[in-house]
Structure formats: C-alpha cells, structure tokens
Amino acid sequence: QEKLDEKKKFYVDSGQPAKFYQEYMMEVQSAEDSIFNMRHINYWDGMFKTDGDFAFLQIDGQEIPVNPYLGVDPATDSERRESDYSVIIAIAVDENNTVYVLDYLRQRGLPVLGIPGEEKKGIVDHIFEYNSIFKPRITVIEDTTMSRPVFQSITSEMRRRNDFSVKAKAEKPGTRMSKRDRIQEIMAQRFAIGAVKIKKSHYDLQHEIITFGSRM
C-alpha cells in the first residue's frame, strides 16, 4: 500500500492523476465526458485554526477569517454500505465565498455507530470527531430514508456523551435535477472561477473531481 501511495503522489504531482487510476486501479475515463479537468483544480496550503468561536486559515502569514461547515452523505443501509462510500467533508468559506476543503472521510462499510470497546467507528462517531476538530457552524446531512438512523443516533449520542454541540440539519437532495445536473449548475461555476480550493494531499477528491462524468 505504501508503494501504491508513492506512485499515486508521483502522478498527482506531475499533473496526471487519471493516469495512476488508469494504470493501477483499472479505471478509464474519457476526457471528453468529464465535466472538470486539471485546469479547474486550485490548491491551498495552510493551517485551519480556531480561537473560541472564531475560525481562521493561516495562509502565507495571513489570517483569513472563515466559517467552517460539515457535509455528510451516509451510505448506512446494509445493501449500500459495502458498495457505496460514506462521505464526511469539512469545508471553510471566507468573505469572498471561496470554499476551502479542510479534510474529508471517504470510506465503505461504515455502520451508523461503532461497537463500544472495539476500534471500528461508525459514521456518527466520525461526525462527533470532526465536530470537535472543526467546530462547524452547521452539519448538513443528506435527508433520505437511509440517513434517519444517523439523526436518531446523533440525538442519543449527544445525551450519552453530554455533548450537544453538533448542529445537524437535514437537507433533502431534491428530485427535479439529477446529481450530475446539480453539480454542473452549482459547482461547475465555482470551479470555473477558482472559488473551490483543495489540498495537494486530497488525492481521492481530486480524482473524483476530474473523472466526474460517464465512464468509458
């Protein structure tokens, strides 16, 4: 795994992440079908810090005030859990509405809650961890039938932990547009003007961005 990570870093640093996934992960993507390409990728390099209720980024010696947020897309039912990824993403937004990706979790096989006494954590355990680190203004969770156990577990865990700081909000995905159309309408404009920035270490996220579209 370490050698594979080194090869992934080499291809990402050379501006050819898709080549890594094509050669080593057997994933092929048509560039013509992709919504985004490497020109849409903008990086940021710095630190996220909090001081009480105040959050800011330290970039090139400057402190940039930001509002942190958490987004959660759970795959928690028994059928989806092993095939689909559960995702938690932490972002920060500055006064110019620029989005900085702080960190993310992308993992298959996540239960709603981990079993006490065992190392494996559930998605709710990770939500509390991310909430403690980034202190998001709000945690948005996609509101589906499958996510309802997540909300129930957050409520019960807040009581058990005596920690009521998670500000969870349900967000319905909507049915008027497909996910691809929603991304094209909302995210493509942000990427086009450089209003979304990720870190160079976000290999999997970069891959998801530049290969979003139909597979060959």
PLM regions and their residue ranges:
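Hydrophobic alpha-helical segments and helix-packing faces
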Residues: 68, 81-84, 116, 120
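Structured core elements
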Residues: 70-71, 90, 140
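Short, conserved, surface-exposed binding loops centered on an aromatic residue
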Residues: 56-64, 78-82, 129-133
